[in-house]
């Protein structure tokens, strides 16, 4: 039986209303209790338990490989670590595309088993009916358009979106808004297109490599703190945590081998 989430968590969906904050919205991905506990004190507007966990946590080759239970286990830990944060959970590939009924069942299962605030799913006009069905069931939905990692094979690889398909992406943004989403992620979309969409739709736009003019910004925390193998162009590294961890481990190993650990104050009385 899963542990019930904290009843003290506050819903902050109003933060996503255009102009309600008077500033940019700021969010990061998060995948575990300990990191969530730290991020809960960083004045972020939201945390996303993204399907990017497929690679950075589970080591799969693409985001489409992660399954629902794997995401739910992570999300439940994040909610326990940051019970007062607005936490969004990605619906994994294959858990919502088939039908409105499946999409609603998956979204409700995620919310019930994790205590999260909302779900996110990929796709614009082609997934508008799924968004609408989930919203009607009472679950807030964040959309995701532009580059959609779950369908990378159909997109032909990692490519900037909007250079030759701007009209389609614009229509996707409108469809997501009309379906009832409270916000939409625009990933790897040209800055000009992201600016146009942001100025013309009424829901908040969250940029991931989409330039300066979106209503908010989102990054994968592993990229931000230097815990990723690959360096992402649109994600500057503010630290090199991989080097810090390696240095700590090597120093401790050295102390063990040289008889300097444990010291007296490391031994329980």
Curated annotation (Swiss-Prot):
Query: Which ranges form a coiled coil?
Result: none
Gene Ontology terms: cellular component = cytoplasm
Pfam annotation, one family: Pantoate_transf
Quote the pathway field.
Answer: Cofactor biosynthesis; (R)-pantothenate biosynthesis; (R)-pantoate from 3-methyl-2-oxobutanoate: step 1/2
Q: What does the record's cofactor remark say about binding?
A: Binds 1 Mg(2+) ion per subunit.
Into which family does the record put it? Belongs to the PanB family.
Q: What is the protein's name according to its record?
A: 3-methyl-2-oxobutanoate hydroxymethyltransferase
Gene name in the database record: panB
